[in-house]
Amino acid sequence: MNYIVSTYLTTGPDVQRGNIFKESDDINYIQGWYDSIIKLGLNGVILHDALSDNFINHLPGIKFIKVAGCGRFQLYDYIWILFKDFIEKNDFDNIFFTDLWDVKVVKDPFIQPEYNDYTIFCGDVNGDVMRGDYFIGAALRNKKLMGLPGFEEIITSDRLLLNNGTLGGSHKIITGFIKTLCSLILEMADREIDVTCDMSIFNYMIYTKFANEFYAGPPVNSRFKKYENRDDVWFIHK
């Protein structure tokens, strides 16, 4: 079984968008992702904390799973805890985790010639590097992260900035990656800092533990925030 999994969470503030709370049951938030999943006949799953039965019943063809609210966790860090729980509770062969409102699936990623069982696939940010990125740089305020061997050197380097808004791979490689990522987020997250740490930890983990086992950029994703309409990539991300 192959899955495309995303989240629709409304009980915690979005620190990337001024700490606003997302509205529940907003069809515009899900429509593009949903339509693309249905068109391709993929197994789509949305983990949610507050969607109504009426809203869910109007979106057949995908699976909705109710989860607890984020509680003490930053919203974006909590998402990875949910993804870890999903892979532990469900059998799968291959899986992609994606953002929801700004992602559309263009091609079934699991049948593309570039796809294989030994690679972690993720997005990039138009070839940008980590040095100077706001969300990566904000992690420099987290003293626990700064204590990780090589952390500062990696996130202030000219290494390619990786985007975890589209991330996937086979059960063989993605399970260990997600579990390790989640464990590190739980250990390093700092609730007193008004930024999420998942992006910096994601990049750090790739470059320290999976440097020879990842692929980023086209054909996995379109150019980030360019709102492209193209058919030569697996995912359009904004």
PLM features: residue spans?
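GT-A fold catalytic core of metal-dependent nucleotide-sugar glycosyltransferases
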Residues: 80-136
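A structural signal for short, well-ordered beta-strand segments and their strand-loop junctions
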Residues: 4-5, 45-48, 95-99, 105, ...
